[in-house]
Amino acid sequence: MSFLFLEIMIFGAEENTLRLGVKTKPAIHDDLGIIPLFSWYHESFDKEVDITGVRIPPLEMACKDFHACKWPKGLSIRDQSLALLFDAYNEEIKDHVNEIRSKCEHIITFSHFVPRQELCPEKRMLFYPNLPKVIGSDLLENRIRKIHGKEGNPKACHVFGHTHFCWDAVVDGIRYVQVPLAYPRERKRRMNGGERWLPFCVFSDGKFGDKHSPCYWSDYYAVNPRTPHNMELAPWVSPFYKYRIQR
């Protein structure tokens, strides 16, 4: 696969989305700027200590991307090469971004992947504790800060996805929101998301919508500190690993 073919794969989908009425370019609506951002994850995004004492399936077994995605030579899921490539595509919209920053009072950026690790539960809370290695990008967070400002501001919001954890929190001056529809089986078990939550109004009448409630994980971390060095698996996770004890 060549880089040219990769770009055709990525950007060629735009024609089909336009037919559906889906816009993929930065845009201004009244006083609101909307900026979609390219990104891909990298393993080094995970800065927290790994869970030990149990055998966790390798990423290749747990993540379909390792088998379903084919990349040109020189690009790998195991390093930052893909994250750097996708972030570089954001340079192509920098003129649109500068226009939005100069004209708009409120700005919403959005991405599929996660920009900060604290927007995901700690590893001991996760059915797959190594999930943080395949969810986000530091480059994405840097890009967001270039747009909204290093310190953020009350009129900045970033909408993200991928993990299916409901989240609505302000971190370092920027509001981060994920209100997932989730998979049908997750909705059936009332895990992570559901139709009853949606649609969620992010912006209306010149202001951001009220905080989504209930929002289990961000509500949890609003009152509980993050303790990534805690190796004790959560009660709903430990049964899945009781036969995987490392010896």
Question: What is each of the regions a protein language model found here?
Answer:
Residues 131-132, 136-155, 163-247:
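Binuclear metal-dependent phosphoesterase catalytic core
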Residues 34, 112, 162, 176:
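Divalent metal-coordination and catalytic microenvironments
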Residues 15-23, 92-106, 143-158:
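A structural motif corresponding to the C-terminal end of an alpha-helix
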Residues 1-33, 122-136:
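Core catalytic region of metal-dependent phosphoesterases/phosphodiesterases
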Residues 3-9, 48-51, 123-126, 172-175, ...:
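Short, glycine/charged-enriched secondary-structure capping and boundary segments
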Residues 35-108, 113-131, 207-247:
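Active-site-proximal loop/helix segment associated with metal-binding centers of metalloenzymes
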Residues 1-5, 25-26, 41-46, 114-118, ...:
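Active-site environment of divalent metal-dependent phosphoester hydrolases
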Residues 28, 38, 180:
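Residues at the C-termini of beta-strands that transition into short coil/loop
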